[in-house]
Amino acid sequence: MGHKKPTETTRSYLENAPLPNHGKTYTVVTHKEVIDNTLTLLKKSGFTVQREIYRANTNATIAQGIYHIYPSRSVDEDIINETELGMMFAWTNSYNKLVRFQCAIGAYVKVCYNGMVAGDMMNFKRKHTGTANLDCSINIADQVKNAEKYYKRIIKDRDAMKTINLTEREQAELVGRMFVQEELIDSQQTSIIKAELAKPSFHYGTDAESCWTFYNHVTHALKKAHPRYWLQDSQNFHDFIVAECLNTSKPTIKTETILSEKVVVISEPVEKVIEVDEDITDTQLIENVFLDQ
């Protein structure tokens, strides 16, 4: 936030951007290496790349690649029959030390190209030191290997959002919290969300008070985010909505106490529940311990 807004660019522009010279301890992970490794691994893993989107700041010191992909070899009926969401792979890379390499499998809404990234999917961020080149390639492969599992989790979250209604006031309160408390959106994005609430640019198949509609108003605004922030902002927003609207593991118990003919509503959260992701792989555990996260 506070940076010059990015522009879409070409693959050739990123591949030919000047390389940095930050000393012997800095390992350059070139945009070209990331692009080549991504496209090669996607093809070998049975994914068809339907669209490539590249964005960058001035001089391409921070770059981003977004790929709309289709799992050509999938035999999963839920994935084969999904028509609203497409699968997405995205990465962010830099030459100026402002952001570590990061990548994630996610989804995009076909009607508007809004992106979706869930928090536990973006499990790798690598400094440009030592064996960064190899480590980045390994992580791209790990994300691609688990693509269908991650994609189905997003589909499940989408379905849950469609069952939840948010009043106009509740939506306004969420926007205010995202701007003031969470710092997930900036003033321009807040204005975009306000405009979308009044007059949506797209129809998302749900009514104005649907959590799914609200989610898309925000992800539409997040498309204005700088490449340095877009993946992280998308992840944080998804986590925010899951915690505030979808997470039923922490229900609120409301009790009424009558005092002097007045009703006092006391809200007390129940005891916290710690959830363990049993699908964590050995690769992810090793990355968390040894790759300076």
Region annotations inferred by a language model:
Residues P71-Q293:
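Intrinsically disordered, low-complexity regions enriched in serine/threonine
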Residues T58-S74:
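Charged, often glycine-rich, active-site loop that binds/positions anionic groups
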Residues M1-I62:
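N-terminal low-complexity, intrinsically disordered segments
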